[in-house]
Amino acid sequence: LPAAVPHIGADGGLCYIAKGTVVLDIYDPVGQSLACLERATSVLGQILNGRLVEDLAEEFFAYWHGLFCFVDMQSKDLGEQNCLVVQENGRSLYFVTDDESRTTGKLKSLGYKVTDKTVLTYRVKTKAQPRPLTSHWPPETVGDILEWQSTLDPQCRRKIHERIKEGERRKANGSLIFIESPLMTYGFAVFYDRRHLLRKKKFVDRRDLSYRLKVMPISVVRIDDGYLAQRNIPNSKTLAGKNIAVVGCGTIGGYLADMLVKAGAGTFGGKLILVDFDSLFPQNIGRHRLGFPDLLSNKAEAMSKELRRLTPSVEIRALPVDVRQAQLGKLDLLIDATGEESLGHWLCGHYPHPTPMLSVWIEGPGTAVRALIRTTTSGACYRCLWHSNRRGELRSTVEPLPVILAGHGCEGLYVPFPASVSVQAASLGTEMALDWVNGTNSPALRTRLIDRTKQLATPDCDPCHDPECPLCNF
């Protein structure tokens, strides 16, 4: 067989079924084994007939093993890059970045300390998807790399060679070359042999000795905020770059803020504002995103601290005040996660259209979770829904919501429901926020029925503003 063929790894193993795509019947081992052998025979036959060569591009990383290098790049700039070197358990880790302070913050969260060392690093771009050479693989020298790249993109090959020779002129001991392709980012390290270079200078050898330099494949691991937010929602926009305020960091808002950050909020120049004047008490912990270490802390400040711990580069502003005294500035999206009806009405009046407003709340003792987004003057606001509910319209359940209170005395009473209900409300809010940023605001009113003993009264819909609403008919 050639040095590199599709579906055969470096260890000689044959990949005939993608991992995780087939469920084998453990109660039919003989039949399943025969089916696997039949599939493996079919794949191997196609390989021997010279087919499936195109699969080499999709499987490139299976043929490209090497030292891990972490890349935290938000810009598209090519050329020389900044590389931080970290010592961890006696080994060196490399982090390529376009923002040293941002990446250093991430490294501090891991307990890593940046050294004063650096590595000459270059970034080049190609139009070709990588695929291994079937004649000679893996590449061991610069000559092998250049021969390989000439079959993919001759222009990129020239750029790579120029950067390697530039590192030689700068008397570097080694350099990292990263190649941005349409499919992925991959790279390799070049090791400069100073003995050959000194001999070349002494005897005025005109040959280009860079072809003999040893290389080592580099496995690129992306840790940039854009990749982390978008990997699980490909082909969709994230919340990166948006100014978003979450009012209420309680049982809904805490989980919601966490999910929003995972969806890109507070990155790429955007900001996440958390507003809550309340503190965390023991009775809150059972259904709150925060825990015992945050006891008696302000919810907005503690949640901000927790999110920075999880995502060190996130831009968060905590406002431990009543939202009625807060200055939120220009917003792309306002989210009311307080579940307080009167405050929700005030927010609708104080932040009218064109500021998009998303309200998320829990109905009854966890009977249902609902969310309403207002993006147009013709659409209903949160106050409109109150008028409709009074007339028996747009309700969540056919039956009246049960009134269940727990606790002792007037000050200790509360509506009981588990944390799972809070998470479902936060999930619905995140879903609608992502739909909003992707231009989908319908249905504007969404309900997720949790209590299966109840009957859903209102399917997801787009309610118009209510004629009785004093805010929409002012």
Where are these regions (language model features)?
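Ser/Thr/Pro-rich, low-complexity mucin-like regions
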Residues: 35-53
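Short, glycine/acidic-rich hinge or "gate" loops at secondary-structure transitions
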Residues: 51-63
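N-terminal charged helix/coil linker that caps or initiates catalytic domains
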Residues: 185-243, 267
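Compact alpha/beta protein-protein interaction domains typified by the UBC
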Residues: 1-20
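Glycine-rich adenosine-cofactor-binding loop
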Residues: 235-269, 273-281
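A structured beta-alpha segment of the ubiquitous adenosine-cofactor-binding alpha/beta core
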Residues: 302-330, 338-342
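Glycine-rich phosphate-binding loop and adjoining beta1-alpha1-beta2 segment
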Residues: 271-311
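Glycine-rich phosphate/adenylate-binding loop
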Residues: 67-211, 330-333, 337-474
